[in-house]
């Protein structure tokens, strides 16, 4: 059946246009644009009850703010900020509204909270002799000669947090008696309202799964006494999801020394406790450590070195080493970390981290290579048998840097292999050392004609 012809034409026929143009001189007239719109009410409009209620509430809040400004009565938190506790402005309504907003957003899907990846920036790592004293305040230290370990009394994370909270409450009541050193660097006591707000933030973080973080928590890195306020949130009660968000916020906003202290006091003990209880590391804590490598200097000084000093287990070394293996670390930071690891006691965990850093195949300075040779030479003084992980670290060193060590160093390593060698790995190390040129020697090149 043929298609029905269209009855309505989009434009006039050509002969009509020509006839009209001969009369008016215009070939075609531009069609007028007529806007089609719905019929609008010409009378007075009415608002529903819900909209009227919102307008009245906003007007009431604005009137209260204007009254407070005219009376000149700032809130306790704003007065606390004016004393030098905060760089930016913070008002009570902002904290409370952010807390309520985070309560409503708690059930949002957390699929978007972990996928964001920031552009990585790295800072220089400076190794000095004072690094060992970094952890003496809260963690045990290792002293004495090799094999003689003297552990001091440790302070757990929960005890430290409760101590800080009790001090803050005592300061608010005026019952705290500071020491002479604290009086010199004393800050004004925390207002009761600040303690109350951040205690509520801590309750929220103890149940946090996904959603927005309270704004009152996000501004903590900008405060001069950020550590005291952070303890009010009870970091030992945080969920792993909250630990990830906190690490992301603090690592990106704190200075390297402060970020190093945050990793040592908060994250290190939390990670070790989780591995000890579950025999594996929670995914969000794992991602928090990866995010902390945003500042490798703070990560090595504040997390890895204290972990190795505190008798790191092979399970912990395998888990943390996988993070170090997946993330790219700058050459200077890797070289400085290797130099420091060779100064620690001989252990399987230390060998795991050394092997992972050597497997990155960076061009290391001769000073680092010499320290690695001396580290392997210390094996001769051990009475215990070496683990396979330790033999593997020496094999990786021989494979990657056999052309960068001297003949004398090769002879010393061969002597170590003869005394402490593995039945299957030892011959591989010997083959790599013997069938290679040494430092400063020319590599013969076979010419084919």
Curated annotation (Swiss-Prot):
Record field: compositional bias (Polar residues): 73-84
GO MF term set: snoRNA binding
A cellular-component GO term for this protein: cytoplasm
Record PTM Phosphoserine, positions in chain: 22, 156
UniProt keyword annotation of Phosphoprotein present: yes
Keyword Nuclease: no
Domain of life of the source: Eukaryota
Biased composition (Basic residues): 1-13
Region (Disordered) location: 1-125
GO biological process: endonucleolytic cleavage in ITS1 to separate SSU-rRNA from 5.8S rRNA and LSU-rRNA from tricistronic rRNA transcript (SSU-rRNA, 5.8S rRNA, LSU-rRNA); rRNA processing
Keywords per UniProt: Phosphoprotein
Family: Belongs to the bystin family.
UniProt name for this protein: Uncharacterized protein C13G1.09
Source species of the chain: Schizosaccharomyces pombe (strain 972 / ATCC 24843)
């Amino acid at each position: 059946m043929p298609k029905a012809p269209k009855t309505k034409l989009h434009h006039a026929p050509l002969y009509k246009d020509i006839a009209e143009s001969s009369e008016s001189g215009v070939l075609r007239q531009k069609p007028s644009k007529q806007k089609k719109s719905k019929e609008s009410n010409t009378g007075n409009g009415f608002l529903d009850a819900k909209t009227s209620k919102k307008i009245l509430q906003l007007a009431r809040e604005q009137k209260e703010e204007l009254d407070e400004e005219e009376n000149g009565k700032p809130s306790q938190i704003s007065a606390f900020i004016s004393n030098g506790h905060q760089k930016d402005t913070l008002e009570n309504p902002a904290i409370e509204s952010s807390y309520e907003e985070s309560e409503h957003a708690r059930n949002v899907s957390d699929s978007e909270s972990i996928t964001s990846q920031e552009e990585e920036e790295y800072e220089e790592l400076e190794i000095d002799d004072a690094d060992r004293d970094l952890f003496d305040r809260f963690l045990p230290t290792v002293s004495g000669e090799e094999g003689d370990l003297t552990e001091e009394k440790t302070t757990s994370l929960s005890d430290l947090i409760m101590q800080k909270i009790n001090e803050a409450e005592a300061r608010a009541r005026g019952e705290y008696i500071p020491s002479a050193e604290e009086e010199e660097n004393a800050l004004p006591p925390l207002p009761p309202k600040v303690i109350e707000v951040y205690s509520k933030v801590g309750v929220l973080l103890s149940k946090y799964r996904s959603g927005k973080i309270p704004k009152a928590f996000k501004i903590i890195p900008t405060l001069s006494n950020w550590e005291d306020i952070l303890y009010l949130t009870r970091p030992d009660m945080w969920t792993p999801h909250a630990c990830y968000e906190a690490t992301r916020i603090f690592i990106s906003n704190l200075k390297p020394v402060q970020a190093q202290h945050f990793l040592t006091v908060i994250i290190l003990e939390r990670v070790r406790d989780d591995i000890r209880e579950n025999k594996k590391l929670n995914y969000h804590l794992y991602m928090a450590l990866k995010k902390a490598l945003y500042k490798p200097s703070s990560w090595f000084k504040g997390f890895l070195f204290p972990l190795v000093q505190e008798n790191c287990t092979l399970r912990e070394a395998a888990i943390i080493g996988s993070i170090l293996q997946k993330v790219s670390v700058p050459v200077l930071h890797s070289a400085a970390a290797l130099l420091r690891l060779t100064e620690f006691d001989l252990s399987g965990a230390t060998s795991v981290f050394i092997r992972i850093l050597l497997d990155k195949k960076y061009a290391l300075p001769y000073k680092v290579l010499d320290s690695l040779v001396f580290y392997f030479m210390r094996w001769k003084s051990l009475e215990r048998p070496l683990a396979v992980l330790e033999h593997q670290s020496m094999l990786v060193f021989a494979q990657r840097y056999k052309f960068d060590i001297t003949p004398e160093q090769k002879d010393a390593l061969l002597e170590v292999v003869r005394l402490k060698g593995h039945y299957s790995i030892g011959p591989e190390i010997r083959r790599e050392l013997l069938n290679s040129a040494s430092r400063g020697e020319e590599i013969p090149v076979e010419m084919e004609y």
